[in-house]
Amino acid sequence: MAIMRKSHPLMKIVNHAFIDLPTPPNISGWWNFGSLLGLCLILQISTGLFLAMHYTSDTLTAFSSVTHICRDVNYGWLIRYMHANGASLFFICLYIHIGRGIYYGSYLYTETWNIGILLLFLTMATAFTGYILPWGQMSFWGATVITNLLSAIPYIGQDLVEWIWGGFSVDKATLTRFFAFHFILPFIIAALAMVHLLFLHETGSNNPLGIPSDCGKVPFHPYYSTKDFLGVIMLLMLFLTLVLFFPDKLGDPDNYMPANPLNTPPHIKPEWYFLFAYAILRSVPNKLGGVVALVMSILVLALLPYLHTSKQRSLMFRPLSQTLFWMLVSDLFLLTWIGGQPVEPPFIIIGQVASIMYFSIILLLMPMAGLIENKLLKW
Protein backbone atom coordinates (compact mmCIF):
# COMPACT_ATOMS: atom_id res chain seq x y z
CA MET A 1 0.00 0.00 0.00
CA ALA A 2 1.32 3.46 -0.92
CA ILE A 3 2.21 5.86 1.89
CA MET A 4 -0.79 8.14 2.54
CA ARG A 5 1.19 11.38 2.16
CA LYS A 6 2.23 10.24 -1.33
CA SER A 7 -1.19 9.02 -2.48
CA HIS A 8 -3.86 11.21 -0.84
CA PRO A 9 -4.71 14.12 -3.21
CA LEU A 10 -4.45 16.81 -0.50
CA MET A 11 -1.54 15.31 1.43
CA LYS A 12 0.35 14.89 -1.86
CA ILE A 13 0.42 18.69 -2.35
CA VAL A 14 1.72 19.25 1.19
CA ASN A 15 4.24 16.44 0.72
CA HIS A 16 5.67 17.94 -2.48
CA ALA A 17 5.89 21.40 -0.92
CA PHE A 18 7.13 20.75 2.63
CA ILE A 19 8.30 17.16 3.13
CA ASP A 20 9.87 15.48 0.09
CA LEU A 21 10.78 18.76 -1.64
CA PRO A 22 14.32 18.42 -3.07
CA THR A 23 16.35 21.27 -1.52
CA PRO A 24 19.96 22.40 -2.09
CA PRO A 25 22.18 21.06 0.70
CA ASN A 26 24.00 24.35 1.29
CA ILE A 27 21.32 27.05 1.72
CA SER A 28 22.10 29.34 4.64
CA GLY A 29 20.03 31.08 7.30
CA TRP A 30 19.15 33.83 4.81
CA TRP A 31 16.73 31.32 3.21
CA ASN A 32 14.72 31.12 6.46
CA PHE A 33 12.89 34.38 5.83
CA GLY A 34 10.42 32.93 3.31
CA SER A 35 8.93 30.64 5.95
CA LEU A 36 9.13 33.45 8.54
CA LEU A 37 7.07 35.65 6.20
CA GLY A 38 4.47 32.87 6.11
CA LEU A 39 4.45 32.86 9.92
CA CYS A 40 4.07 36.68 9.99
CA LEU A 41 1.13 36.46 7.59
CA ILE A 42 -0.64 33.82 9.71
CA LEU A 43 0.04 35.92 12.83
CA GLN A 44 -1.34 39.09 11.19
CA ILE A 45 -4.47 37.40 9.82
CA SER A 46 -5.30 35.71 13.15
CA THR A 47 -4.70 38.81 15.35
CA GLY A 48 -6.45 41.00 12.76
CA LEU A 49 -9.51 38.75 12.79
CA PHE A 50 -9.90 39.15 16.57
CA LEU A 51 -9.38 42.92 16.32
CA ALA A 52 -12.04 43.15 13.58
CA MET A 53 -14.54 41.52 15.97
CA HIS A 54 -14.34 44.56 18.26
CA TYR A 55 -13.44 47.40 15.87
CA THR A 56 -16.01 49.79 14.38
CA SER A 57 -15.18 51.52 11.09
CA ASP A 58 -16.98 54.77 11.84
CA THR A 59 -15.22 58.14 12.22
CA LEU A 60 -17.08 58.87 15.48
CA THR A 61 -16.30 55.55 17.20
CA ALA A 62 -13.14 54.13 15.49
CA PHE A 63 -10.67 55.74 17.91
CA SER A 64 -12.70 54.84 21.01
CA SER A 65 -13.23 51.26 19.73
CA VAL A 66 -9.42 50.80 19.62
CA THR A 67 -9.23 52.24 23.17
CA HIS A 68 -12.01 49.82 24.19
CA ILE A 69 -10.03 46.88 22.74
CA CYS A 70 -6.97 47.86 24.80
CA ARG A 71 -8.86 48.53 28.04
CA ASP A 72 -11.89 46.23 28.18
CA VAL A 73 -11.32 43.21 25.91
CA ASN A 74 -9.50 40.25 27.50
CA TYR A 75 -5.89 40.48 26.32
CA GLY A 76 -7.04 43.09 23.79
CA TRP A 77 -3.93 45.17 24.46
CA LEU A 78 -1.78 42.14 23.59
CA ILE A 79 -3.68 41.38 20.37
CA ARG A 80 -3.53 45.05 19.32
CA TYR A 81 0.22 45.39 19.98
CA MET A 82 0.98 42.02 18.36
CA HIS A 83 -0.87 43.21 15.25
CA ALA A 84 0.79 46.65 15.18
CA ASN A 85 4.33 45.33 15.79
CA GLY A 86 3.65 42.28 13.62
CA ALA A 87 3.51 44.66 10.65
CA SER A 88 7.00 45.94 11.50
CA LEU A 89 8.24 42.38 11.85
CA PHE A 90 6.64 41.50 8.50
CA PHE A 91 8.51 44.31 6.74
CA ILE A 92 11.83 43.48 8.44
CA CYS A 93 11.53 39.90 7.13
CA LEU A 94 10.32 41.17 3.75
CA TYR A 95 13.25 43.54 3.23
CA ILE A 96 15.79 40.89 4.31
CA HIS A 97 14.09 38.38 1.96
CA ILE A 98 14.37 40.84 -0.97
CA GLY A 99 17.96 41.71 -0.02
CA ARG A 100 18.87 38.03 -0.06
CA GLY A 101 17.21 37.67 -3.46
CA ILE A 102 19.33 40.53 -4.83
CA TYR A 103 22.58 39.32 -3.22
CA TYR A 104 22.32 35.72 -4.42
CA GLY A 105 20.76 36.45 -7.83
CA SER A 106 17.40 34.80 -7.05
CA TYR A 107 15.72 37.43 -9.26
CA LEU A 108 16.72 35.34 -12.30
CA TYR A 109 13.69 33.15 -11.47
CA THR A 110 11.63 35.84 -13.21
CA GLU A 111 8.08 34.56 -12.50
CA THR A 112 8.77 33.99 -8.81
CA TRP A 113 10.48 37.40 -8.56
CA ASN A 114 7.65 39.30 -10.31
CA ILE A 115 5.00 37.71 -8.10
CA GLY A 116 7.21 38.68 -5.15
CA ILE A 117 7.14 42.33 -6.30
CA LEU A 118 3.35 42.14 -6.61
CA LEU A 119 3.24 40.71 -3.07
CA LEU A 120 5.38 43.64 -1.86
CA PHE A 121 2.98 46.17 -3.42
CA LEU A 122 -0.04 44.41 -1.88
CA THR A 123 1.65 44.23 1.54
CA MET A 124 2.41 47.95 1.35
CA ALA A 125 -1.22 48.67 0.42
CA THR A 126 -2.42 46.52 3.33
CA ALA A 127 -0.10 48.26 5.81
CA PHE A 128 -1.16 51.70 4.56
CA THR A 129 -4.90 50.99 4.80
CA GLY A 130 -4.35 49.45 8.24
CA TYR A 131 -2.52 52.52 9.53
CA ILE A 132 -5.64 54.63 8.80
CA LEU A 133 -8.00 52.48 10.90
CA PRO A 134 -7.20 53.70 14.48
CA TRP A 135 -8.29 57.18 13.24
CA GLY A 136 -5.60 59.05 15.17
CA GLN A 137 -3.96 62.27 13.97
CA MET A 138 -1.27 60.52 11.92
CA SER A 139 -3.87 58.10 10.49
CA PHE A 140 -6.03 60.95 9.20
CA TRP A 141 -3.24 63.18 7.88
CA GLY A 142 -1.27 60.24 6.47
CA ALA A 143 -4.37 59.17 4.52
CA THR A 144 -4.94 62.74 3.31
CA VAL A 145 -1.34 63.28 2.15
CA ILE A 146 -0.76 59.88 0.51
CA THR A 147 -4.13 59.60 -1.29
CA ASN A 148 -3.67 63.21 -2.48
CA LEU A 149 -0.57 62.08 -4.41
CA LEU A 150 -2.89 60.48 -6.96
CA SER A 151 -4.08 63.98 -7.94
CA ALA A 152 -0.69 64.35 -9.70
CA ILE A 153 -1.88 61.91 -12.39
CA PRO A 154 -2.76 64.02 -15.47
CA TYR A 155 -6.47 64.42 -16.47
CA ILE A 156 -7.99 61.83 -14.11
CA GLY A 157 -6.01 62.61 -10.93
CA GLN A 158 -8.54 64.76 -9.02
CA ASP A 159 -11.50 62.53 -9.96
CA LEU A 160 -9.51 59.48 -8.87
CA VAL A 161 -8.74 61.02 -5.45
CA GLU A 162 -12.41 61.94 -4.84
CA TRP A 163 -13.46 58.47 -5.99
CA ILE A 164 -11.09 56.85 -3.46
CA TRP A 165 -12.19 59.24 -0.69
CA GLY A 166 -15.88 58.67 -1.45
CA GLY A 167 -16.41 62.44 -1.09
CA PHE A 168 -14.50 65.70 -1.08
CA SER A 169 -12.26 64.87 1.89
CA VAL A 170 -11.04 61.91 3.95
CA ASP A 171 -14.15 61.00 5.96
CA LYS A 172 -16.47 58.16 7.01
CA ALA A 173 -16.71 56.67 3.49
CA THR A 174 -12.89 56.57 3.25
CA LEU A 175 -12.50 54.83 6.61
CA THR A 176 -15.18 52.22 5.79
CA ARG A 177 -13.69 51.30 2.41
CA PHE A 178 -10.13 51.23 3.83
CA PHE A 179 -11.34 48.77 6.47
CA ALA A 180 -12.87 46.62 3.72
CA PHE A 181 -9.62 46.71 1.72
CA HIS A 182 -7.52 46.02 4.81
CA PHE A 183 -9.63 42.96 5.59
CA ILE A 184 -9.60 41.40 2.11
CA LEU A 185 -6.00 42.12 1.01
CA PRO A 186 -4.23 39.68 3.41
CA PHE A 187 -6.26 36.80 1.94
CA ILE A 188 -5.24 37.86 -1.57
CA ILE A 189 -1.64 38.00 -0.30
CA ALA A 190 -2.00 34.46 1.11
CA ALA A 191 -3.32 33.18 -2.25
CA LEU A 192 -0.50 34.91 -4.15
CA ALA A 193 2.06 33.52 -1.70
CA MET A 194 0.87 30.05 -2.74
CA VAL A 195 1.43 30.99 -6.41
CA HIS A 196 4.86 32.39 -5.43
CA LEU A 197 5.71 28.98 -3.89
CA LEU A 198 4.28 27.12 -6.89
CA PHE A 199 6.61 28.95 -9.29
CA LEU A 200 9.56 28.55 -6.91
CA HIS A 201 9.02 24.78 -6.73
CA GLU A 202 8.94 24.61 -10.53
CA THR A 203 12.60 25.69 -10.66
CA GLY A 204 13.79 24.65 -7.19
CA SER A 205 15.55 26.93 -4.73
CA ASN A 206 18.66 28.91 -5.57
CA ASN A 207 21.73 28.51 -3.30
CA PRO A 208 24.57 30.76 -2.04
CA LEU A 209 26.97 29.60 -4.78
CA GLY A 210 24.46 30.41 -7.51
CA ILE A 211 25.22 27.13 -9.33
CA PRO A 212 22.90 24.17 -10.08
CA SER A 213 22.67 21.76 -7.14
CA ASP A 214 20.55 18.98 -8.67
CA CYS A 215 23.21 16.35 -8.04
CA GLY A 216 23.20 16.74 -4.25
CA LYS A 217 19.72 17.77 -3.15
CA VAL A 218 18.29 16.65 0.20
CA PRO A 219 14.64 16.33 1.31
CA PHE A 220 13.17 19.42 2.98
CA HIS A 221 12.06 17.42 6.04
CA PRO A 222 13.70 16.87 8.55
CA TYR A 223 16.69 19.08 7.60
CA TYR A 224 15.12 22.42 6.69
CA SER A 225 11.91 21.98 8.68
CA THR A 226 14.12 21.83 11.81
CA LYS A 227 16.21 24.76 10.60
CA ASP A 228 13.09 26.84 9.87
CA PHE A 229 11.72 25.98 13.32
CA LEU A 230 14.87 27.43 14.91
CA GLY A 231 14.25 30.63 12.92
CA VAL A 232 10.63 30.68 14.14
CA ILE A 233 11.73 30.39 17.80
CA MET A 234 14.30 33.19 17.40
CA LEU A 235 11.81 35.43 15.59
CA LEU A 236 9.11 34.88 18.22
CA MET A 237 11.59 35.72 21.00
CA LEU A 238 12.49 38.99 19.26
CA PHE A 239 8.82 39.70 18.56
CA LEU A 240 7.59 39.07 22.11
CA THR A 241 10.43 41.19 23.53
CA LEU A 242 9.25 44.04 21.30
CA VAL A 243 5.54 43.56 22.07
CA LEU A 244 5.86 43.09 25.84
CA PHE A 245 8.66 45.55 26.66
CA PHE A 246 8.62 48.22 23.91
CA PRO A 247 5.13 48.09 22.34
CA ASP A 248 5.11 51.75 21.25
CA LYS A 249 8.75 52.01 20.21
CA LEU A 250 8.00 51.85 16.46
CA GLY A 251 4.72 53.79 16.51
CA ASP A 252 4.02 57.52 16.33
CA PRO A 253 2.88 59.34 19.52
CA ASP A 254 0.61 61.57 17.38
CA ASN A 255 -1.61 58.57 16.70
CA TYR A 256 -2.70 58.58 20.36
CA MET A 257 -4.56 61.82 19.61
CA PRO A 258 -7.97 61.48 17.91
CA ALA A 259 -8.09 62.67 14.28
CA ASN A 260 -8.74 66.39 13.96
CA PRO A 261 -9.12 67.83 10.44
CA LEU A 262 -8.58 71.37 11.83
CA ASN A 263 -5.19 70.68 13.41
CA THR A 264 -2.22 69.52 11.30
CA PRO A 265 0.61 67.63 13.09
CA PRO A 266 4.04 69.37 12.85
CA HIS A 267 5.59 66.49 10.86
CA ILE A 268 3.40 64.17 8.80
CA LYS A 269 5.27 60.93 8.24
CA PRO A 270 4.36 57.29 7.56
CA GLU A 271 5.44 54.24 9.57
CA TRP A 272 9.21 53.54 9.60
CA TYR A 273 9.01 50.85 6.90
CA PHE A 274 7.81 53.40 4.31
CA LEU A 275 10.25 56.17 5.22
CA PHE A 276 12.80 55.28 2.50
CA ALA A 277 10.13 55.61 -0.22
CA TYR A 278 8.75 58.77 1.44
CA ALA A 279 12.26 60.31 1.38
CA ILE A 280 12.57 59.53 -2.35
CA LEU A 281 9.11 61.09 -2.93
CA ARG A 282 10.08 64.28 -1.06
CA SER A 283 13.47 64.62 -2.75
CA VAL A 284 11.82 65.48 -6.11
CA PRO A 285 10.55 69.11 -6.14
CA ASN A 286 7.82 68.31 -8.71
CA LYS A 287 4.63 66.52 -7.52
CA LEU A 288 4.20 64.18 -10.51
CA GLY A 289 7.97 63.53 -10.62
CA GLY A 290 7.90 62.63 -6.93
CA VAL A 291 5.04 60.16 -7.42
CA VAL A 292 6.86 58.54 -10.38
CA ALA A 293 10.06 58.29 -8.28
CA LEU A 294 8.05 56.77 -5.41
CA VAL A 295 6.53 54.04 -7.63
CA MET A 296 9.85 53.43 -9.41
CA SER A 297 11.67 52.96 -6.08
CA ILE A 298 9.83 49.62 -5.83
CA LEU A 299 9.19 48.90 -9.52
CA VAL A 300 12.93 49.18 -10.26
CA LEU A 301 13.22 45.69 -8.71
CA ALA A 302 11.38 44.30 -11.76
CA LEU A 303 14.27 45.48 -13.96
CA LEU A 304 16.92 43.50 -12.05
CA PRO A 305 16.68 40.32 -14.19
CA TYR A 306 17.31 42.44 -17.32
CA LEU A 307 20.19 44.40 -15.75
CA HIS A 308 22.11 41.24 -14.78
CA THR A 309 25.34 41.44 -16.79
CA SER A 310 27.61 39.10 -14.82
CA LYS A 311 28.38 35.54 -15.93
CA GLN A 312 28.05 34.54 -12.26
CA ARG A 313 24.66 34.46 -10.59
CA SER A 314 25.53 35.14 -6.95
CA LEU A 315 27.57 38.02 -5.48
CA MET A 316 29.50 35.53 -3.34
CA PHE A 317 32.69 35.73 -5.42
CA ARG A 318 32.24 39.28 -6.77
CA PRO A 319 33.86 41.79 -4.37
CA LEU A 320 33.10 44.86 -6.51
CA SER A 321 29.38 44.07 -6.72
CA GLN A 322 29.37 43.14 -3.01
CA THR A 323 30.68 46.62 -2.14
CA LEU A 324 27.91 48.20 -4.23
CA PHE A 325 25.28 45.97 -2.61
CA TRP A 326 26.29 47.07 0.90
CA MET A 327 26.42 50.68 -0.31
CA LEU A 328 22.81 50.20 -1.44
CA VAL A 329 21.85 48.83 2.00
CA SER A 330 23.57 51.79 3.73
CA ASP A 331 21.82 54.16 1.33
CA LEU A 332 18.43 52.67 2.27
CA PHE A 333 19.20 53.18 5.98
CA LEU A 334 20.15 56.78 5.18
CA LEU A 335 16.90 57.32 3.23
CA THR A 336 14.90 55.82 6.13
CA TRP A 337 16.51 58.31 8.53
CA ILE A 338 15.93 61.25 6.15
CA GLY A 339 12.26 60.28 5.66
CA GLY A 340 11.67 60.89 9.37
CA GLN A 341 13.36 64.32 9.40
CA PRO A 342 11.70 67.69 8.66
CA VAL A 343 12.04 69.19 5.16
CA GLU A 344 14.83 71.69 5.87
CA PRO A 345 18.59 71.98 5.17
CA PRO A 346 20.77 69.91 5.39
CA PHE A 347 18.21 67.07 5.20
CA ILE A 348 16.88 68.14 1.78
CA ILE A 349 20.21 67.79 -0.02
CA ILE A 350 21.12 64.58 1.86
CA GLY A 351 17.79 63.06 0.74
CA GLN A 352 18.33 64.13 -2.87
CA VAL A 353 21.88 62.72 -3.00
CA ALA A 354 20.74 59.46 -1.34
CA SER A 355 17.84 59.13 -3.83
CA ILE A 356 20.17 59.65 -6.82
CA MET A 357 22.58 57.10 -5.30
CA TYR A 358 19.76 54.56 -4.87
CA PHE A 359 18.77 54.61 -8.54
CA SER A 360 22.38 54.95 -9.76
CA ILE A 361 23.58 51.86 -7.88
CA ILE A 362 20.72 49.68 -9.19
CA LEU A 363 20.46 50.99 -12.76
CA LEU A 364 24.06 51.90 -13.60
CA LEU A 365 26.77 50.86 -11.16
CA MET A 366 25.79 47.22 -10.53
CA PRO A 367 25.43 46.31 -14.25
CA MET A 368 28.77 48.05 -14.92
CA ALA A 369 30.43 46.20 -12.03
CA GLY A 370 29.18 42.90 -13.52
CA LEU A 371 30.81 43.70 -16.87
CA ILE A 372 34.08 44.78 -15.20
CA GLU A 373 34.20 41.54 -13.17
CA ASN A 374 33.62 39.48 -16.34
CA LYS A 375 36.51 41.33 -17.96
CA LEU A 376 38.82 40.80 -14.97
CA LEU A 377 38.06 37.06 -15.02
CA LYS A 378 38.64 37.03 -18.83
CA TRP A 379 35.10 35.69 -19.43
UniProtKB/Swiss-Prot annotation:
InterPro entries recorded for this chain?
Cyt_b/b6_C, Cyt_b/b6_C_sf, Cyt_b/b6_N, Cytb/b6-like_sf, Cytochrome_b, Cytochrome_b_C_euk/bac, Cytochrome_b_N_euk/bac, Di-haem_cyt_TM
The biological processes this protein is annotated with in GO are: mitochondrial electron transport, ubiquinol to cytochrome c
Q: Which residues cross the membrane?
A: 33-53, 77-98, 113-133, 178-198, 226-246, 288-308, 320-340, 347-367
UniProt: heme b b566 binding residues: H97, H196
Q: How is the cofactor bound?
A: Binds 2 heme b groups non-covalently.
**Binding annotation for heme b b562:** H83, H182
Domain of life of the source:
Eukaryota
Q: What does this protein do?
A: Component of the ubiquinol-cytochrome c reductase complex (complex III or cytochrome b-c1 complex) that is part of the mitochondrial respiratory chain. The b-c1 complex mediates electron transfer from ubiquinol to cytochrome c. Contributes to the generation of a proton gradient across the mitochondrial membrane that is then used for ATP synthesis.
Q: What else is known?
A: Heme 1 (or BL or b562) is low-potential and absorbs at about 562 nm, and heme 2 (or BH or b566) is high-potential and absorbs at about 566 nm.
Assembly information from the UniProt record: The cytochrome bc1 complex contains 11 subunits: 3 respiratory subunits (MT-CYB, CYC1 and UQCRFS1), 2 core proteins (UQCRC1 and UQCRC2) and 6 low-molecular weight proteins (UQCRH/QCR6, UQCRB/QCR7, UQCRQ/QCR8, UQCR10/QCR9, UQCR11/QCR10 and a cleavage product of UQCRFS1). This cytochrome bc1 complex then forms a dimer.
Protein name, UniProt field = Cytochrome b
Q: State the organism named in the record.
A: Geomys pinetis
